[in-house]
Amino acid sequence: MELPWLSLTTFTLSLLIYFSSTTQAFKRCPNCGSTRVPYPLSTGLDCGDPGYRIRCDNYGSLWFDTLNGSTNPIKTIDPSGQRFVLRPPGFEQNKCVSVDIKYHGIQLDLNLPFNVSCSNTVIIMNCTKDGLDAYSSQGFNCSDNSLCHKFLNANLEARGNCRGVTSCCWYKTGASVNTYKVYRARPDMCSAYQSFMNLDLTIPVSKWGEPAVEILWEAPREPVCKSQGDCRDLLNSVCSNDSTNLGQKRCFCKKGFQWDSVNAVCEVNRCSKRKSCKRWSNLPLLGGLAGGVGAILIAGFITKTIVSKQNRRIAGNQSWASVRKLHRNLLSINSTGLDRIFTGKEIVKATDNFAKSNLLGFGGFGEVFKGNLDDGTTVAVKRAKLGNEKSIYQIVNEVQILCQVSHKNLVKLLGCCIELEMPVLVYEFVPNGTLFEHIYGGGGGGGGLYDHLPLRRRLMIAHQTAQGLDYLHSSSSPPIYHRDVKSSNILLDENLDVKVADFGLSRLGVSDVSHVTTCAQGTLGYLDPEYYLNFQLTDKSDVYSFGVVLFELLTCKKAIDFNREEEDVNLVVFVRKALKEGRLMDVIDPVIGIGATEKEIESMKALGVLAELCVKETRQCRPTMQVAAKEIENILHGI
C-alpha cells in the first residue's frame, strides 16, 4: 500500500525540482533594506543588469541618479509593470524655487533604458514672461484659469512658498519611448515645478495625493556573455552570438525555453507546439466563462447562432418577412424604452412616401428623411438600406443602445416601425444639420457656420459633445462605446446645442473589463490607431476621435484631406507637428485667430493641448471623457 504513495511523492518532488531549476533567476540583487530589488535593476556590479543602475544607501533606501548630479528617492517599484515611482524635490525654504534647480530638474540620460511615463502631470511655477511665452508656444497650458492656479491656491506647501506668484503652467509629460525629462528647471524661465501621477483633474487639489514621478524601464534583453561560464546562473541558456549586435554574445535560451524579461529566467515555452499552446491558452478563458462575463459571452454566442441561421434562410431567397419577425422579437425586449411603435401607414404619410424632397442625408446604413407627424411634430426618419443586411443589424443595434440612454446631448429615439419592407427608426428632429456641414459648408443656414460662430460657441459645442460621450462611458451600465465619433455625427439644434447621433456602430462594454475585442470599424481619420491595430475597443477609442473633432473646431480643416501636402494629409499629424514646433496659432482657423484677445489665444492653445492629449498613440496616456469635459469647462470660464 505504501509503494504507490512513495512513487507519487517521488514523482511530485521530481517535478518540483525540475520546475524550480528552470525558473532560477539570473543575478537578482539582494534586498535594499526591506525593499526587493527586481531584475534588471542593479545596485552593484555583480547583480542585475549594469545598464539599469540604481543606488542602495547605508540606511536601506533606494535612489535613482539622473543627469547633472540630481538624485531622487525611489518610493515604490512595480516589476510586472517595469516601472518605479520617484519622490520629486520640494521647494527651497520660503522660496518658490525647486530644491534641484541647480541640477535643472529631473532629466534622464538618453543612453540609458529609462524614460518618463505618460502618467505624470507637471505643474511649473514662478515663470518669467519669456518662460510663459516659450512654454505656451510649446503647448503648455498657461492660461489664467489653468489647473496650476488651483494648485497654487489650494496646496499648502505651494501656497506657503509661492505667495503672490501668479505665473504658472501645466502639462502632461511622457507618452513616448524618447521622453527623457520631467522638467528642465531654469531661473530665467520657471524656477519651480511639481509632478503628480495618474492625476484626476476633476477632484479637489486636497485629494491629489503626494507628489510623484513615474519612470519606466525598457524590457531587458538576455545577459551579455563572453563564454558559457558567464551563463551558469541562467539555466537552460547557451552563450552565442547576438545577431543584432555583431561582436557581442548573449545568454540565449535553449530550444523549448523562452526569455522571461520580468523574472530573468529561461522558462519552459509551453506554446512551442501548436496543440500545447492551444491547451494552455484556453485556461484563462475557461476561468472567465465561470463568471458574469462568461454569461454574456454565452448569450452572445446563442444570439449569433440564431442570427446566423436567419441569415442562411435569407440567403435561400426567402422573404424579408422572416427578418421583420426577428426584429419584432428583438424590439419587444426593449419596447419599454421606446415612446412609440409607429405603423407603416404613419411613416409613409409623415415622409410623403419617402419623397426625395424630404431626404436629409444618407450613408452606409441607409437614408434619413424629414417627416411630419399628425400632431405637428417634426421628426427624422432613418430607413435601412433595401437588401443590405448589415444596415438592418446596425439599426437594430441602435435601438438596443438608445433604449438605454437619456441625456440632453444625445439624440432621442422616439420610436420605430417594423411593418414596412425595411425597419425604420424615428428620432427627434434636430434642425441645424451636422457640425461637419456647418464647418465645411452646406449647413442649416446656407453658408458656413463659422461666419458667425465665435470661439465661445465652439468651446460650448466641444463641451456638450464631451458631456454626452462621458454619459455613455460613465453613467451607463455597462458602458457604451460610440465607435464613430466625428463631426458629421454631431447634430446642432436651433440654439446650436449638441445632439450626438448615429449609434449604429456602438457597442456595449463589459463592466470591470478594460476593452471589448471587435473588428475595427469607424471613419478614416477619426479611428483610434490602437483599436485599428489591436481590435481593442475602449472608452479611449472615443476619446481619440473626440480629439480629432477638437482639431477640426480649432483649424476648420478636415480629418483627412488629400489636397494638403502628402505628410499633412492626416489632420492629427498636421496639427501635432505645429504644436511640437510651437506654431499652433499658424494653423488656427483665421475666423477665430485673427484679432483674438490674449485670453482667447490662451484658450485656443489650451484646447490644442487637450486635443493633443486625446490623440496620444497610447490609450493609457489619453484623458477620460470626464476629464476632457472638465478641462473644457475650465477653458470656458477663462474667456
UniProtKB/Swiss-Prot annotation:
Domain of life: Eukaryota
Major location category of this protein: membrane
Its membrane topology: Single-pass type I membrane protein
MF (Gene Ontology): ATP binding; protein serine kinase activity; protein serine/threonine kinase activity
Keyword Disulfide bond: no
Cytoplasmic face of the membrane: 304-639
Active-site residues (renumbered): 484 (proton acceptor)
Sugar attachment sites: 68, 115, 126, 141, 241
PANTHER family: LEAF RUST 10 DISEASE-RESISTANCE LOCUS RECEPTOR-LIKE PROTEIN KINASE-LIKE 1.4, PROTEIN KINASE DOMAIN-CONTAINING PROTEIN
Name of the protein described by the UniProt record: Wall-associated receptor kinase-like 15
Record organism: Arabidopsis thaliana (Mouse-ear cress)
